[in-house]
């Protein structure tokens, strides 16, 4: 099975094996490159959460415990300690789907405080190293 089919079929076993081979620290590093675990809008919304992308060091600092393989495996399917926001997942998925172009969402409020649609997003840069 390849990545495309594993995603299409939501094949957990494929992602368990990838996670096991890569390890949680490489998963964490890659997830952060896609914008997971980071605020999207910055100070625009005071209530926005960053989420959490765990690593061995995070667990040691936060819980005083060592990381175990089972945690790596479930991290591979987005379970365990991972916390993300819907907009983070949307932007990550868009970057995968469009071949590596990272975009930031834009919120436009008109004079009447109504959210207006945006005609076109401008890509910031191409990050196709993460897309194979």
Predicted regions mapped to residue ranges:
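Beta-lactam-recognizing serine transpeptidase/beta-lactamase-like catalytic domain environment
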Residues: 1-132
